[in-house]
Every structure is written in structure tokens, then in C-alpha cells.
Amino acid sequence: MRLCGFEAGLDKPLFLIAGPCVIESEELALETAGYLKEMCSQLNIPFIYKSSFDKANRSSISSYRGPGFEKGLSILEKVKSQIGVPVLTDVHEDTPLFEVSSVVDVLQTPAFLCRQTNFIQKVAAMNKPVNIKKGQFLAPWEMKHVIAKAKAQGNEQIMACERGVSFGYNNLVSDMRSLVIMRETGCPVVYDATHSVQLPGGNNGVSGGQREFIPALARAAVAVGISGLFMETHPDPDNALSDGPNSWPLDKMKQLLESLKAADEVYKKYSTDF
């Protein structure tokens, strides 16, 4: 699949979707995008910047949701034009899709909305690449039906993203078999290594997370075989305004990605999966 100027697929080099969970400020967005662009250029990893202008599914009414549509989209436009990177953002049922699609390169549908047929089809109809996150409640073999809804709009630029599955209350686990199963859809499979360590709503109305497990799960996913990696990162995760406990420190990204790139190259050299 052609994606933002590069080829995405199981037999292609690993690509990265990364950035802060939510847009906190223009300065932070430009800083992180510039840092990640330079790092990925050095490592020769295709890169897409991500951040959200509205986190509509925060645990608490008092949680920071973002700068809103107009300001957030303006910041993403500056990231794209000033830093020179493709951008991804998530959209919701009330998002003005035409306006967002005029700026961003990739649309993302939230996990909680993956079963909303009208929503999935409206997003796919924008004819932009779409990263569809698998719901925490959904079996991996059910993703073929979600993908079919999107492709029924004539859009073949669809990705399937694994972000963990509910395991009791306030806990997620990663079933690596799901990566293999979702590959059967024929879509590039992306692994979200940061939301997969989230503890949803488990901290008195605020989601917690187990950041220390991000490297292990990311390495496991790369070893199983994926097309892309999704990671939320922040210069100061402990003070991030959203999803800090499951964000990876920006200054540790390069070291982690060096090991993941090496693992991806080994997998793609010896794999019989393609």
C-alpha cells in the first residue's frame, strides 16, 4: 500500500506513527515533530506525526481534551508545512471531516467507534489513508468486517491497528496472535505499543499505565511481523496532559527504535510469512 510517499506492507521496512497523545501547545507540537523527523531520518524509518486536537473519550469530565478543532487543526497544518512531515489525527462522529481531510494526511478512527458502520464509512469516503483501531472488546477475526465496511466506500488505503484487549477491569493485554489474524485482511497491520500498556480508568477517574512494558511488547510485535508501529511519546511523560503513564520518553525513542529496526530487519530477512 502506498502511504505518505512510501510503501507500507509486511515485506516493507517498518514505519513509525508517533507524537504526543494530545496537542498541548504549538511549541510542543513543533518541537516533538522536529525531533522525531530528524531521528527517523538518521535511522531511515518512514515517519508520520500524530497528535489529537480533541480527545473525546477521556475518563473524567475534568480531563484535558485538547485545544479544539480550529486551533488544533491550525497547529497540525504548521507541523506539516514547517517541519515537512505527514500528519495523522483521530476523528470522531461530529468532526468536520472535509476540513480535517484538507489538512491531514491520515485519518484515524478511535477503538471505541470501530463498530459504528456509518462513522467508519464516512471516514473511509474521504479517500484518505485510514488507521482503524481495533476495539478493546473486539476479537481480531471480527476486524475483517470493519475493514470491509471501509473498503465498500472504494478506499483501499486502510490499516488495521491493534491496541490491546480488555482483560478484566481496568487492564489490557496484547494477544500477539491478533497481529497474524488481522494480516489476513490484506491490510497493513499497525501495533500500538503505548496504548497497549494502558490501565483504562484505573486510577480514580484517570487512566494509568505501565510504561516499563512498552519495549518488550514492541519487540514482540515486531518479531511476530507488523507493517507499522504506533507510539505516543512526550518530552516529559510524567507531566503530560493526556496518557502520560503510557507514553514513552522522547529522549529514549532513538535507542528503542534502533533495536526495533534491527529486529524488523531480521524478521523480514528470514520470515516465510510473505
UniProtKB/Swiss-Prot annotation:
Instruction: Assign the protein's first listed, main location to one coarse class.
Output: cytoplasm
Q: Does the keyword Transferase apply?
A: yes
Q: Which transformation does this protein catalyse, written as a reaction?
A: D-arabinose 5-phosphate + phosphoenolpyruvate + H2O = 3-deoxy-alpha-D-manno-2-octulosonate-8-phosphate + phosphate
| Gene3D superfamilies, per the entry | Aldolase class I
- What EC number(s) has UniProt assigned to this enzyme? 2.5.1.55
A molecular-function term among this protein's GO annotations: 3-deoxy-8-phosphooctulonate synthase activity
Q: In which pathway does it act?
A: Carbohydrate biosynthesis; 3-deoxy-D-manno-octulosonate biosynthesis; 3-deoxy-D-manno-octulosonate from D-ribulose 5-phosphate: step 2/3; Bacterial outer membrane biogenesis; lipopolysaccharide biosynthesis
Task: Specify one Pfam family.
Answer: DAHP_synth_1
The compartments listed are:
Cytoplasm
UniProt keyword terms in alphabetical order = Cytoplasm, Lipopolysaccharide biosynthesis, Transferase
One GO cellular-component annotation of the UniProt record comes to:
cytoplasm
Cite a single GO BP annotation: keto-3-deoxy-D-manno-octulosonic acid biosynthetic process
Task: Note the NCBIfam families from the entry.
Answer: KDO8P_synth, PRK05198.1
Q: Which family does it belong to?
A: Belongs to the KdsA family.
Protein name per its UniProtKB record: 2-dehydro-3-deoxyphosphooctonate aldolase
Give the gene that encodes this protein.
kdsA
